[in-house]
Amino acid sequence: PDGLVTGVQTCALPISAIDGAGVQLVRLVGNNDVKEFDPFLLFDAFDATDPATYLKGFPWHPHRGIETVTYLIKGEIEHGDSLGNVDVIEEGDCQWMTAGSGIIHQEMPRPTDRLLGGQLWINLPAKHKMTEPRYKPIVGKDIPVIEEKNAKIRVLTGEYKSTPGATQGDFVKAT
């Protein structure tokens, strides 16, 4: 279709980073390349086997005008926020947090043999930046799984081969 971009447009090199209260991670998007990936502002991946590198977590901090999507493959993370939500993200779970007009939250990993997952920051469109903040936990058992060859594909949002995701974004649609 007209306007469809095909092929590789940009290669982003990941960098090692430390965020929160000292959590070691790999930043795949969000260095100096934000304009090229909008509406995706940041994507961090974390894979740690030494609790000393992640247990200080991400203490109380604010967000505004974005959504964060955290997906956990291994481990557990405690979530709390200024809306009164308290939750534990477990293996295979996802959390979708809309900061909108503003939210304060924390994500504190629990000690485990391995903490593995990622977090994506999505820029809200200008007309939705001041929307009401909200928190949406997505339990792993509610995420559709498609098996292909040697892979299991978990469909968090959007649609893959006619299988709808566990949730649909209200502001930025998966294509």
Question: Residue ranges of each PLM-predicted region?
Answer:
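Terminal peptide-recognition signature
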Residues: 13, 69, 120
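Single conserved hydrophobic/aromatic residue that forms the stacking wall/gate
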Residues: 1-11
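A short beta-strand-loop-beta hairpin characteristic of the jelly-roll/cupin
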Residues: 55, 70-90, 100, 104
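Phosphate/pyrophosphate-binding betaalpha-module
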Residues: 121-134, 140-145
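"Short basic amphipathic alpha-helical interaction patches in structured regions
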Residues: 83-90, 109-111, 134-137
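A short glycine-rich, His/Asp/Glu-containing loop-to-beta-strand
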Residues: 18-73, 142-175
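Ligand-binding loop in jelly-roll beta-barrel domains
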Residues: 100-128
